């Protein structure tokens, strides 16, 4: 059995390495030496977790309890721990300082099991139990092990890479060749449990992708639409007959029904069932299929009667975000009514529908989803006529919606999980008004505010994702569009992610260094007018290419439904600039 010390030492080594290839090589070498559950457990631990994203894997133990556990483990006062924490800024480093050198005895399996026990402790006295379980394992840990146990417990591992590096490492470790990484990535879009994926690859090698299929209770990654520059481009990209569906300003959702159990998952694969009890109840009443997986959008919405006329009222995305609160669910259920608009069906009564064409899936969707006051199908039109398409777009905008998504009806119009596909094309109101695009950007720094903004940020340094290198490259500074409430909420979010220096996966030029560095965690939506060359930014910069920057950026909203690795990519902004 592999000692946890080997994993902790690799964590420490990986923190210092910046080379993509070297990180993948180290990971592959490590996974190649694991057996059984060690493979699955380690896959989770490298991402600072103890399970897949769609499970609630938070351990329910914050700084205060961790401080108490460290004090108990090392026989010092809580005040001493707090004092050291104030100086070091990292409770993992405090554990390292206080721990005594001892023989390494803990295995990966033991540590993982203990972390699961901490998570599962509940009910009366659960805080004391969690503290005791953590304190006990710290007493058995070496200084290096203690440091990383604490960071994992607090969700602050910060190795500076995401799951893409792991997928490449799995390809080398379990198939002997990096060329299988593309297939493994496709498999991960369907089997979104990184531990299950790793273990199956370890057992079956290059043949493993054939073992993965969609199943209720495990969300797949969402298929996404490409953007186009004009209706003419839309017509060129999807020739002949096409469907155009209304595009809503809401939250993407996957609904999974298996018998009496119904779950809702976000685009980030998080379980959001508890936040939407009204959606769950309506699905139970409206859908009779025994097992079904549906793709749709939750929208802040109400049907009103005015002068004996039924009127649909769509409310802003900000209203909907009130429903993401984990507390006072019933209060906000009344305050913010919602509806779900389904536009796809991915699984039905034991059969995956991912390889069915869009027309086949839509027919099944219409057959098995009965609309109610809360459950709806997306309104659509099917046409070959560009004028009819423009008329439909104008109708959606008049209703206060974002725009349309045009969908191919061809024989290859399958559901491409996890892919931004040319089979779906989006055209939004902002494009028609001359604004180039909205971007989902990652906040990586902030600059001190002045005047009314004193004590807050004056501007945010934002980055795009370089998919190949899995790093964040600066693209713009955003200083307009914020309300006082926005600024207050952003300050609160960023305070949990401030770091003393730029994370190794954030690339910033000297002239753009912010006053405060932020680890990649918070995503905001930004509207801009033009992408230009910029020697000051690093987005898309290469040996023969200057960086790219967004002109006249304006903050629109916080994207709670986006993870950093869901952000706008370098390739996307380059394609936009070049008009591809």
From Swiss-Prot:
GO molecular function, one term: DNA binding
One biological process term in Gene Ontology: DNA recombination
Enzyme Commission designation: 6.5.1.1
Keyword Mitochondrion: no
Binding residues for ATP: 245, 252, 267, 297, 343, 420, 426
Chemical reaction(s) catalysed: ATP + (deoxyribonucleotide)n-3'-hydroxyl + 5'-phospho-(deoxyribonucleotide)m = (deoxyribonucleotide)n+m + AMP + diphosphate
Metal-binding in keyword set: yes
Cleaved signal peptide residues: none
Domain of life: Archaea
Residues annotated as catalytic: 247 (n6-amp-lysine intermediate)
Listed cofactors: Mg(2+)
Keywords on record: ATP-binding, Cell cycle, Cell division, DNA damage, DNA recombination, DNA repair, DNA replication, Ligase, Magnesium, Metal-binding, Nucleotide-binding
Functional description taken from the UniProt entry: DNA ligase that seals nicks in double-stranded DNA during DNA replication, DNA recombination and DNA repair.
PANTHER family according to UniProt: DNA LIGASE 1, DNA LIGASE 1/3 FAMILY MEMBER
Family: Belongs to the ATP-dependent DNA ligase family.
Protein name (Swiss-Prot/TrEMBL): DNA ligase 1
Organism for this UniProt entry: Methanosarcina acetivorans (strain ATCC 35395 / DSM 2834 / JCM 12185 / C2A)
């Amino acid at each position: 059995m592999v000692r946890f010390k080997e994993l902790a030492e690799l964590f420490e080594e990986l923190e210092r390495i910046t080379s993509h290839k070297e990180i993948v090589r180290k990971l592959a070498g490590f996974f190649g030496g694991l057996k059984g559950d060690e493979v699955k457990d380690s896959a989770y631990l490298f991402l600072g977790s103890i399970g897949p994203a769609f499970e609630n894997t938070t351990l329910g133990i914050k700084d205060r309890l961790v401080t108490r556990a460290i004090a108990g483990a090392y026989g010092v006062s809580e005040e001493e721990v707090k004092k050291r924490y104030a100086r070091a800024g990292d409770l993992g480093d405090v554990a390292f300082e206080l721990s005594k050198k001892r023989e390494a005895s803990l295995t990966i399996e033991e540590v993982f099991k203990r972390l699961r026990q901490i998570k599962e402790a509940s009910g009366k006295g659960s805080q004391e139990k969690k503290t005791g379980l953590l304190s006990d394992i710290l007493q058995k840990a070496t200084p290096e092990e203690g440091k990383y146990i604490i960071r994992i417990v607090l969700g602050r591992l910060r190795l500076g890479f995401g799951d893409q590096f792991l997928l490449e490492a799995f390809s080398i470790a379990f198939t002997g060749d990096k060329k299988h990484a593309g297939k493994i990535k496709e498999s991960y879009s369907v089997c979104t449990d990184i531990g299950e994926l790793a273990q199956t690859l370890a057992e079956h090698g290059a043949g493993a992708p054939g073992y993965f299929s969609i199943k209720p209770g495990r969300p797949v990654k969402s298929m996404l639409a490409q953007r186009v520059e004009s209706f003419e481009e839309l017509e060129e990209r999807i020739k002949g007959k096409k469907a155009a569906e209304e595009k809503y300003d809401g939250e993407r959702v996957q609904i999974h029904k298996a018998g009496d159990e119904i779950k809702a998952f976000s685009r980030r694969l998080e379980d959001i069932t508890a936040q939407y009890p009204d959606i769950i109840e309506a699905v139970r009443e409206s859908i009779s299929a025994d097992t079904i997986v549906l793709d749709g959008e939750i929208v802040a919405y109400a049907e009103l009667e005015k002068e004996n006329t039924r009127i649909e009222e769509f409310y802003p995305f900000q209203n909907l975000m009130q429903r993401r609160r984990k507390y006072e669910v019933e209060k906000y259920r009344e305050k913010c009514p919602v509806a779900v608009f389904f536009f796809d069906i991915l699984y039905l009564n034991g059969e995956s529908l991912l390889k069915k064409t869009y027309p086949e899936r839509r027919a099944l969707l219409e057959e098995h989803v009965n609309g109610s006051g809360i459950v709806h199908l997306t309104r659509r039109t099917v046409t070959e006529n560009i004028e009819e398409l423009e008329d439909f777009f104008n109708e959606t905008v008049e209703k206060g919606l974002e725009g349309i998504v045009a969908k191919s009806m061809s024989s290859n119009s399958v559901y491409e999980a996890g892919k931004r596909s040319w089979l779906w094309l989006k055209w939004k109101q902002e494009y028609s008004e001359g604004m180039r695009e909205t971007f989902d950007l990652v906040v990586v720094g902030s600059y001190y505010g002045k005047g009314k903004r004193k004590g807050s940020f004056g501007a945010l340094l934002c980055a795009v994702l370089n998919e190949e290198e899995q790093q964040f490259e600066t693209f713009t500074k955003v200083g307009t569009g914020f309300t006082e409430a926005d600024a207050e909420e952003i300050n609160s979010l960023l305070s949990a992610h401030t770091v003393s220096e730029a994370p190794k996966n954030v690339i910033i030029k000297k002239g753009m260094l912010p006053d405060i560095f932020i680890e990649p965690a918070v995503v905001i939506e930004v509207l801009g007018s033009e992408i230009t060359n910029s020697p000051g930014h690093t987005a898309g910069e290469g040996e023969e290419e200057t960086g790219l920057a967004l002109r006249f950026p304006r903050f629109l909203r916080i994207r709670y439904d986006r993870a950093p690795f869901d952000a706008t990519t370098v390739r996307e902004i380059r394609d936009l600039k070049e008009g591809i």
